[in-house]
């Protein structure tokens, strides 16, 4: 079986789990083995399973070569617990798999997981705020937005069409947007952009949009320092000072401005262990349980580098500010430690980069329901984060500028000319909303019939075409759209009105004969009756 990239979408973790099982069952060699004077057909050693699965994961573009052998052993333990494999005596259900010579086999039953039935998020379409009717009690403070300035030359070009003939005009001021209005615009446009980047028809299966806090998005976009790190209004939610000092010490090693210089061997390892213990005891990962499916879906875009970075930029913008700040500081420290050649090794057996991924993956990404591929998925995401953290953890400039321009457009003063309708000259932005299936079918029927009825009326009242052509066109229309035709011409009498019969009276025979001159050698008709 040829492994393929599992793209973004709902149930991506379950799809990956099933794909790995299928690849493992198809690629694992089965042979005859002997154990304690007995022969067993179609089985394999534990060490052989580790070798095979490790190679499959390393060559699979959904996981990559950074998967370690220990992670492979942990996954095989999950396989044994979930009855993907069993020992030669048919035992399973425990995670007692070891990288040794014990014999295992595949059970005859299907080990694939069914796709979970997630509760519907209501498929509620995000509504843009009605800024004409602000709610009482909302703050009038507005977020700083980019002002659009026009010099005199630009203004002249825009308004120079027959300047001498421009009628009287007046300025129409839009009501100022409230803080809540602008926050809802940020939320709506951010989620719309995320949906487009992920290539999904709907975000309902990967995120509950009701759980997205519009205030968090705005705070993450504007409350940042010179380094792009989020600043918190509530300092009690920040990292403790001693953890910040420890992180700065390792990130800037050997320059430790906040701590005294180490006085004993292994000092840096103790500092690192302190940081690991602090982040390990958190009740919720930094990417939060609510957004687990979103980030797992983004993993399907890693082959498309630019799209993956933009999707992660937007997804990280949805985080609570305190989680985003901790993530920024932690990933920046991890990246600096990985590339710091002056820092002594923090482990005897594991490379520093691998150690960073193993130590902090779980506190960055994991699911609430303890899924079986959590560790591998988190390791893949954290590795990508470390390599591109400066771009991913910055505010997406294109999204920010487009939202700011939209807000300015809504707030901009409009010019209304005499006799003109302001809304017709400067149409306000219109937005879509979801409708029911019955309403859609009704709109599809009526919406297509109106232009057809107009076309039929045009044919019927057109005096420039001949009667023959008109009848031909009407007959073709009746054949193609009988329902529309029946509405306009319910009876033959209504159709006959278009073609009044002309009286065809023959001229008197005498007058006809007299009009022609008498010609010799031709018989003329007798005038006698």
Swiss-Prot record:
<dbReference type="InterPro" id="IPR008936">
    <property type="entry name" value="Rho_GTPase_activation_prot"/>
</dbReference>
<dbReference type="InterPro" id="IPR036388">
    <property type="entry name" value="WH-like_DNA-bd_sf"/>
</dbReference>
<dbReference type="Pfam" id="PF00610">
    <property type="entry name" value="DEP"/>
</dbReference>
<protein>
    <recommendedName>
        <fullName>DEP domain-containing protein 1B</fullName>
    </recommendedName>
</protein>
<feature type="domain" description="Rho-GAP">
    <location>
        <begin position="192"/>
        <end position="393"/>
    </location>
</feature>
<dbReference type="GO" id="GO:0035556">
    <property type="term" value="P:intracellular signal transduction"/>
</dbReference>
<feature type="site" description="Arginine finger; crucial for GTP hydrolysis by stabilizing the transition state">
    <location>
        <position position="231"/>
    </location>
</feature>
<feature type="domain" description="DEP">
    <location>
        <begin position="24"/>
        <end position="108"/>
    </location>
</feature>
<dbReference type="GO" id="GO:0005096">
    <property type="term" value="F:GTPase activator activity"/>
</dbReference>
<dbReference type="InterPro" id="IPR036390">
    <property type="entry name" value="WH_DNA-bd_sf"/>
</dbReference>
<dbReference type="InterPro" id="IPR000591">
    <property type="entry name" value="DEP_dom"/>
</dbReference>
<dbReference type="GO" id="GO:0030177">
    <property type="term" value="P:positive regulation of Wnt signaling pathway"/>
</dbReference>
<dbReference type="InterPro" id="IPR000198">
    <property type="entry name" value="RhoGAP_dom"/>
</dbReference>
<dbReference type="Pfam" id="PF00620">
    <property type="entry name" value="RhoGAP"/>
</dbReference>
<keyword id="KW-0343">GTPase activation</keyword>
């Amino acid at each position: 079986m040829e492994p393929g990239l599992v793209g973004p979408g709902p149930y991506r973790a379950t799809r990956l789990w099933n794909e790995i099982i299928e690849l493992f069952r198809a690629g694992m060699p089965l042979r005859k083995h002997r154990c304690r004077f007995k022969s067993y057909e179609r089985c394999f050693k534990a060490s052989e399973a580790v070798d095979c699965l490790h190679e499959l994961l390393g060559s699979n573009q959904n996981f990559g070569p950074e998967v370690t052998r220990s992670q492979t052993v942990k996954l095989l333990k999950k396989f044994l617990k979930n009855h993907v494999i069993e020992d030669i005596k048919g035992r399973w259900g425990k995670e007692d798999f070891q990288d040794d010579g014990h014999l295992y086999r595949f059970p005859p039953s299907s080990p694939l997981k069914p796709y979970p039935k997630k509760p519907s998020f209501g498929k509620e379409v995000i509504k843009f705020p009605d800024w004409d009717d602000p709610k009482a009690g909302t703050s009038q403070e507005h977020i700083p937005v980019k002002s659009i300035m026009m010099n005199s030359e630009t203004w002249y070009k825009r308004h120079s069409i027959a300047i001498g003939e421009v009628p009287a005009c007046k300025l129409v001021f839009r009501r100022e947007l409230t803080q809540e209005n602008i926050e809802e615009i940020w939320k709506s446009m951010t989620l719309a952009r995320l949906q487009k980047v992920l290539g999904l028809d709907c975000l309902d299966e990967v995120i509950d949009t009701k759980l997205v806090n519009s205030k968090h998005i705005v705070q993450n976009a504007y409350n940042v320092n010179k380094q792009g790190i989020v600043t918190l209004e509530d300092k009690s939610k920040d990292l403790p000072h001693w953890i910040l000092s420890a992180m700065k010490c390792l990130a800037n090693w050997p320059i430790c401005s906040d701590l005294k210089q180490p006085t004993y061997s292994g000092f840096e390892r103790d500092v690192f262990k302190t940081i690991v213990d602090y982040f390990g005891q958190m009740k919720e990962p930094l990417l939060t349980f609510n957004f687990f499916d979103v980030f797992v879906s983004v993993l399907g875009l890693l082959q498309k580098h630019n799209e993956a970075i933009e999707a992660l930029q937007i997804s990280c913008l949805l985080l609570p500010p305190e989680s985003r700040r901790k993530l920024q500081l932690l990933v920046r420290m991890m990246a600096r430690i990985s590339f710091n050649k002056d820092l002594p090794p923090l482990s005897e057996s594991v490379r520093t980069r691998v150690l960073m991924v193993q130590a902090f993956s779980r506190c960055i990404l994991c699911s609430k329901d303890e899924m079986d591929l959590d560790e591998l998925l988190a390791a893949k995401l954290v590795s990508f984060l470390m390599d591109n953290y400066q771009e991913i953890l910055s505010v997406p400039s294109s999204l920010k500028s487009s939202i700011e321009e939209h807000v300015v457009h809504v707030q901009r003063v409009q010019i209304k000319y005499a006799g003109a309708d302001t809304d017709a000259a400067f149409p306000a932005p219109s937005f879509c909303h979801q409708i029911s299936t019955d309403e859609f079918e009704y709109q599809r029927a009526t919406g297509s019939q109106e232009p057809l009825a107009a076309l039929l009326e045009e044919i019927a009242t057109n005096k420039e075409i001949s009667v023959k052509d008109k009848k031909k066109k009407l007959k073709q229309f009746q054949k193609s759209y009988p329902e529309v035709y029946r509405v306009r011409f319910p009876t033959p009498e209504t159709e006959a009105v278009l073609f009044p019969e002309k009286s065809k009276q023959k001229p008197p025979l005498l007058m006809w004969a007299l009009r022609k001159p008498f010609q010799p050698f031709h018989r003329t008709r007798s005038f006698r009756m």
